[in-house]
């Protein structure tokens, strides 16, 4: 499961995942596994634990990096690599000679965008209905028509409350992405 808070805070989930990462790091360090098994363990256990809640969480980039820190420290050194191995290589794809470890923040953003594309298209899906309602609320609050994700977050983002849609809008704007929606405009 995922630890949710009524106020929309993700602190309990953050603390839980941080504890899981530290526990994995301590257990892996104590186990003295062969290098190939450390890498395999990292990919098949703790990284799956970290990826599971990302579809709904709204962690900041610094929170994601704090969650990854104990895992990368033990995972890289246990795999025979330096702890301070360049992160561009660590998070880079195999096709570019990277290690293909997913950065949690990027993975979180991609999962949010994927869910928007998938769920807002189905008018009979409860998740989609909630996303549409949140988008409509943001549009009404800002007094905007058109696709909300096509507007500049840097200009307007400070005017809306922290929500799932707001986080996704911030992520997309940070990386220069735009997404059209089929949400009906107000008249």
Tell what function each PLM region has.
Residues 46, 64-76:
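Short amphipathic alpha-helical coiled-coil/interface segments
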Residues 27, 71-72, 76-85:
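Mixed-charge, polar/low-complexity N-terminal
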Residues 67, 81-187:
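Extended C-terminal regions of large enzymes
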Residues 1-61, 79, 110-130:
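Basic, alpha-helical interaction scaffolds
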Residues 22, 47, 72, 101-105:
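Residue-level recognition of well-ordered secondary-structure positions
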